[in-house]
Amino acid sequence: MRAFIAIDVNESVRDSLVRAQDYIGSKEAKIKFVERENLHITLKFLGEITEEQAEEIKNILKKIAEKYKKHEVKVKGIGVFPNPNYIRVIWAGIENDEIIREMAREIEDELAKLGFKKEGNFVAHITLGRVKFVKDKLGLTMKLKELANEDFGSFVVDAIELKKSTLTPKGPIYETLARFELSE
């Protein structure tokens, strides 16, 4: 199964992010926007894993989740990967993300012991859309600039989740396989 580790966001943040997606629109670029219910912070993309690996990963996530307290983060600003001259991914940023970064680093280290490839430079973000091609670079850049410091609200990081991703012609369908609550 195709899987990843994520943090879900609350409904009000989802509403704000969907408004941003609508504002960005599709006039200046062909963008595959992430569905409302699929908006999340990816801590680690795993790719194809077996049932056995899923069980090992669950054990690791349970231990890690117990070490961290529930905390609030702010979703603010719009950024792009890899850079403004070549926009492939549009994302919303996370402020005060130190704890998320720490969790991601620990997940990375623990999963490396199971043979998962280490990725460097974790940036906590919520992917809003993937750019297929740009029709009007200046227009798109201007829209993104207007949202550069936009406040999309706050939410409480209260759990980490192991999610399954099933690819369909209409886009991926995510299913939560296991949810691990952070400590109070």
Swiss-Prot record:
Function description: Hydrolyzes RNA 2',3'-cyclic phosphodiester to an RNA 2'-phosphomonoester.
Its EC number(s): 3.1.4.58
Active site: H40, H125
GO molecular function: 2',3'-cyclic-nucleotide 3'-phosphodiesterase activity; RNA 2',3'-cyclic 3'-phosphodiesterase activity
Tree of life domain: Archaea
InterPro entries linked: Cyclic_Pdiesterase, Phosphoesterase_HXTX, RNA_CPDase
Motif (HXTX 1): 40-43
Keywords: Hydrolase
Protein name, as recorded: RNA 2',3'-cyclic phosphodiesterase
Catalytic activity: a 3'-end 2',3'-cyclophospho-ribonucleotide-RNA + H2O = a 3'-end 2'-phospho-ribonucleotide-RNA + H(+)
